[in-house]
């Protein structure tokens, strides 16, 4: 009788200890701060290289490996959502607005920053596909990290951002797992910080107003529509800080909306059937006119130098062109402005 009892007890214990149930509990905090408080970050960049991402060299973020305790085959993934307004994009990733001058790039995911998902838009999205714990106890964590973005310059070169709510991450049970009444969503706020912004630029060595005397020609030198003759030339020279790439835009001062490659003649001109084109250096394609703006990516903006040149220059050639409307001799006057963008 005694031996039978011992065998029965051993079998009962074996069966008992192999029974497990998927379970989850919340062990984190519902409200979390991203980044150290009252931090100050400093960077130097070309004046018009905007938007400019402040890569501080380390992660401004929050990570916690122990937010939910899971066991018994529980399956969990993560979804993330950003509540800030989308004010632009960079390489397919949303730029979220903090102030008129400062934005954020945001990543959300599991505990490891390097696996974070670049956030876009304002809808919930999968930021961690998930996993299923075995017959043991483990934890599920999360992380959020950000990079500030300068959107526009200000006169003080300093930008202050107050504490701001960013968004949320929620735990997503799957494969039959259920969270029940367990807290599934945690929220994040960005701690206040200051950006100290030093910009580099160039100085124009050429006079800001350049008069190009146009050579006198005869109508016979432009017999057909599209024919061209060199009328004059000039150069633009600058002195630049190291690392600045210069871009430029020519604008038709008489017709600012002109986006063609033929400069509008002023009202003082008496010749008809002829226009002016401008070429740079040895290019065979004329420059097109664009808006009077230094903004990066401005329409018909063209590259004048690379970041390795500290004394860049460009030679401009002005050519008469037969516009195909029948040439009547007279005076030819045109005004173009040039706007530099320091990127």
Curated annotation (Swiss-Prot):
The keyword Protein biosynthesis does not apply. Residues 23-199 are annotated as: Receptor-binding lectin domain. Keywords: Disulfide bond, Fimbrium, Lectin, Signal, Virulence. Gene3D superfamilies: Bacterial adhesins - F17c-type, Fimbrial-type adhesion domain. GO terms for molecular function: carbohydrate binding. It holds the Pfam family Fimbrial. SUPFAM superfamilies: Bacterial adhesins. Residues 287-307 are annotated as: Disordered. A carbohydrate binds at residues 65-66, 110-111, 138-141. GO terms for cellular component: pilus. Residues 298-307 have a biased composition (Polar residues). Disulfide bonds join 75-132. One of its GO terms (biological process) is cell adhesion involved in single-species biofilm formation. Belongs to the fimbrial protein family. Essential fimbrial adhesion factor that mediates binding to N-acetylglucosamine-containing receptors in the host intestinal microvilli, leading to colonization of the intestinal tissue, and diarrhea or septicemia. Also confers adhesiveness to laminin and basement membranes. This is F17e-G fimbrial adhesin. It comes from Escherichia coli.
